[in-house]
Amino acid sequence: MTYQQAGRIAVLKRILGWVIFIPALISTLISLLKFMNTRQENKEGINAVMLDFTHVMIDMMQANTPFLNLFWYNSPTPNFNGGVNVMFWVIFILIFVGLALQDSGARMSRQARFLREGVEDQLILEKAKGEEGLTREQIESRIVVPHHTIFLQFFSLYILPVICIAAGYVFFSLLGFI
């Protein structure tokens, strides 16, 4: 793969990463709001007021975002107190797959830019040598760009989901939803 191809692949990876990340994030957030809205317990005191406030705010968000109706009506409602939440977890994982794609594309883009600048610098030195200097094509033919896989993005693909799950567990436990 040439560095020009690597630059194009990097742009495609970044675009695909954002295209996967944004809908997955919106769907996950709406799923969590729907989970919070399904809670219909009769509590007393400040807990009842806070639960009613939460329901009103979620209903207001749904009413004021008609452009997100696709997500409001189709995002899976998780049940963390039991049951299978396969679709919710698949969509949740897609957030981090999108981030890993974007990170991989950003890394490839940086490398392609560095290689392009290196070729230009080397070309200047080769022209200073005169006739025995290498041409641009000869320099470019010697460059081997490694393939980048999203599985090497350790933080965004492996560590960040665990941090988000732990923070979500603490958040929902403190609010009494789990």
From Swiss-Prot:
Record's keyword annotation contains Membrane: yes
The keyword Cell membrane is assigned to this record: yes
Subcellular location per the Swiss-Prot or TrEMBL entry: Cell membrane
Chain ranges passing through the membrane: 15-35, 80-100, 158-178
Protein name (record): Uncharacterized protein YniB
A single GO cellular-component term on record: plasma membrane
InterPro entries found in the cross-reference section: YniB-like
Coarse class of the protein's main subcellular location: membrane
Topology with respect to the bilayer: Multi-pass membrane protein
Source organism of this protein record: Escherichia coli (strain K12)
The organism's place on the tree of life at top rank: Bacteria
Family statement: To Y.pestis YfeE.
UniProt entry keywords in alphabetical sequence: Cell membrane, Membrane, Transmembrane, Transmembrane helix
Residues annotated as signal peptide: none
